[in-house]
């Protein structure tokens, strides 16, 4: 079966060095050049026989990302893309924005960092962080929503996915009050996140219902794939931290986006530039 290896970056010069390892055995090389990012796509009649570890290491040194779609995704577009939200589809962390409103920024930020690095159980850390928000007026949710910084290219990614018939889902350990409006803003088809309990217009410091944690993210990916009638091998999972590893394992292709080392190691596919629509290079022909 034919295969492809893709180099992607917002700095075209960073593609040259790793490209020298890919060019000699490729049947052809094509380029995608936009105002914001570039990709070099190397096509192979069969599987790439070179040393992918060496390619990834050299790309990391230059700041380029490496995408190596396999199976169905090597020859056809995805049917479903599922993205983490905080620090993936957004450049901000929802809980940190709310913590600033509550005057608990430093305390909550420390817990968040440890959780995303895999040092703390997510469910326990979520409860600890949300407890810090007890008594916060519901108006802070709108403040946090307005302060949310959407990752460049998010809406463009959704539009590009829809053009090839793929659905897009947002799954987050964050909160429905922020994730649902974001999904509507960028045109995503599905969303799942945690719901904050509110009584008398104030946060109680608790969440309602099942927690969207590491395992739940994979469950939602499978659920949306089934609803969309898409084989799992035609799904893509995109994330940045330890909480994304289960959905990485469930998807046909896992992509670590501007990610922490634990996610990069698990996904083996990377985008290092802050243009999330660069992942459309996976299916560009």
What do these predicted regions represent?
Residues 72-123:
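Active-site neighborhood of HAD-like aspartate-dependent phosphohydrolases
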Residues 1-83:
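Non-catalytic pre-domain segments flanking phosphatase-related domains
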Residues 53, 142-285:
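C-terminal cap/substrate-recognition subdomain and adjoining C-terminal extension
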Residues 103-104, 135, 196-198:
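Short connector loops/turns at beta-strand edges and beta->alpha or beta->beta junctions
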Residues 92-95, 105-109, 123-127, 138, ...:
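Hydrophobic, well-ordered secondary-structure segments
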Residues 39-43, 138-140, 161:
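Active-site-proximal beta-alpha loop/turn segments in soluble metabolic enzymes
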Residues 128-132:
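Long, charge-rich alpha-helical interaction segments
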